Amino acid sequence: MSAIFEILDKDAGGRIGRLRTPHGTVETPTVMPVINPNIQLIPPKEMRNFGAEILITNSYIIYRKEELKSVALEKGLHGLLGFDGPIMTDSGSFQLSVYGSVEVTNEEILGFQQKIGSDIIVPLDIPTPPDVHYRRAEEELAITAERLEAARKFIQSEQLLAGPVQGSTYPELREKAASHLKDLNFEVYPLGAVVPLMEAYRYAELVDVIAASKKGLSPASPVHLFGAGHPMMFALAVAMGCDLFDSAAYALYAKDGRYITVNGTYHVEKLNYLPCSCPVCSKYTAEELKKADNREELLGKHNLYATFAEIRLIKQCIKDGKLLELVEQRCRAHPKLLDGLKKLYTHSSWLEQLDPATKGTFFYCGPESSSRPEILRFGKRLDRFSLQGSVIIRTGSVKGEKDYDQILTFKAPFGAFPVEMEEVYPFNAEVPKFPDYESLNTALSNTLKLIDLNPEAEFTFICEEEFKHPLIEEIRKRAKLVYRKDWKKE
């Protein structure tokens, strides 16, 4: 494990960690509020009041403006912003993505960040946008690789050096880039050029980008999802192993009169009530907030409170082993987020390697829960059950079951398992009495596999009449099938 990053707790791909920097230790996952050196809606010194432990600002803006540059060189970055905690600096790559060029070299901006005392330095990489031709993505990735190799040789101080992972929307390029950077031993790994995906709500593709990048990195590496600032998607990103986010949304949205919640964004003019209990929303009514002279500042503060409240909830869910339940709740806030959730579970084999083998009670939240790592893990381990003689499978206790050699409980979305394991994780799951189609499909598929793995056993399957599914007929071909209402022990 990296000496500067310590993982304390894990759930799914998410983790609570400690990131050590020259200006203090930061607990992750967390958000870095973006500070515009020219326009500060909320002073950096007040950011701790909202829960911020680390900030991010743009070194290129400071470098290009002489009055900011001179103060930063004289007093340091922390003196310029009036913040004594860790500060990360971007290099100008954002301006490069917007304007197509910047008036600084990689070595110049690296040296400037080092001189002003940035805690996390970012090289001048090439942010290749989504959907470009493969050749362009490959060529720009090669330039980025050269710059990052030069940066690794250039920065040898105690300051942390970030190695941005690029590769556009090509998973193979993302994984290749991440694997290369892993060998260079950067301290932080930002995933770059993903803002266009988030702005277009292309969460399924974002999931693929994150997964590919993570597969190329060490599991112990801290990962920063560049430009992710809306709390509605934090849980999904954390579950995939993202540790750091940065948010300019709190200020940009406030300027446009937008009010952030974990379920989406409201325009304040359309709000009759404030669905929040932060200090701002507890003090003002919706009408008072609309008419306030400092409305932009108040909205910015609310947006920060809402952002960090979600981070705290995510951390608690990691502690409780409930992160995926939160992800499934949050991803129902928008159809495109639901696409992201479904895409996440296509990576369940990878996620299962990261997910703890034991944790809190499994809660079934909907059809997507059937694809969770716990279910996949159970399906992989069916060959561990050796069954002989007469075997009864039932959803709940039935008369005469003790006459059988072995008793199995049937519980969707798992399938059949020994009755002795009913109170053991994950079989102590909270599930609906009547399973949906996807849940039943997974459970019956696993049951068929279990029956086929034990050809010497004679199976009796007692199920509910409500179990309407084509696989029931496949069960009937391999076992004696009786509906519970018809069960009579002779």
From Swiss-Prot:
Transmembrane segments: none
A GO biological-process term: tRNA wobble guanine modification
Cofactor binding summary note: Binds 1 zinc ion per subunit.
GO molecular function, one term: zinc ion binding
Pathway connected to this protein: tRNA modification; archaeosine-tRNA biosynthesis
UniProt keywords, alphabetically: Glycosyltransferase, Metal-binding, Transferase, tRNA processing, Zinc
Signal sequence segment: none
Binding site for Zn(2+): C276, C278, C281
One Pfam family this sequence matches: TGT
EC code(s) of this entry: 2.4.2.48
Binding-site residues, substrate: D125, A193
GO CC annotation: cytoplasm
Active-site residues from the entry: D90 (nucleophile)
Catalyzed reactions per annotation: guanosine(15) in tRNA + 7-cyano-7-deazaguanine = 7-cyano-7-carbaguanosine(15) in tRNA + guanine
UniProt cofactor(s): Zn(2+)
Job description of the protein: Exchanges the guanine residue with 7-cyano-7-deazaguanine (preQ0) at position 15 in the dihydrouridine loop (D-loop) of archaeal tRNAs.
PANTHER family the record matches: QUEUINE TRNA-RIBOSYLTRANSFERASE
Similarity-based family: Belongs to the archaeosine tRNA-ribosyltransferase family.
Name the record gives this protein: tRNA-guanine(15) transglycosylase
Source species: Methanosarcina barkeri (strain Fusaro / DSM 804)
Lineage, broadest ranks: Archaea, Methanobacteriati, Methanobacteriota, Stenosarchaea group, Methanomicrobia
